[in-house]
Swiss-Prot record:
Reactions it catalyzes: an organic molecule + reduced [NADPH--hemoprotein reductase] + O2 = an alcohol + oxidized [NADPH--hemoprotein reductase] + H2O + H(+)
Similarity-based family: Belongs to the cytochrome P450 family.
Keyword list, A-Z: Endoplasmic reticulum, Heme, Iron, Membrane, Metal-binding, Microsome, Monooxygenase, Olfaction, Oxidoreductase, Sensory transduction
Protein name, UniProt field: Cytochrome P450 2A
Source species: Bos taurus
Any one Gene Ontology molecular-function term assigned to this protein's record: metal ion binding
Membrane topology, record value: Peripheral membrane protein
Recorded GO CC terms: endoplasmic reticulum membrane
Function recorded in the entry: Cytochromes P450 are a group of heme-thiolate monooxygenases. In liver microsomes, this enzyme is involved in an NADPH-dependent electron transport pathway. It oxidizes a variety of structurally unrelated compounds, including steroids, fatty acids, and xenobiotics.
UniProt cofactor(s): heme
Domain of life: Eukaryota
Length: 18
């Protein structure tokens, strides 16, 4: 995935943290 800046990036980071 690419890099997603903004609030989407935070949600994506939580998905990877699972």
């Amino acid at each position: 995935m690419x890099y997603l800046p903004g609030p989407q990036q935070q949600a994506f980071k939580e998905l990877q943290g699972l």
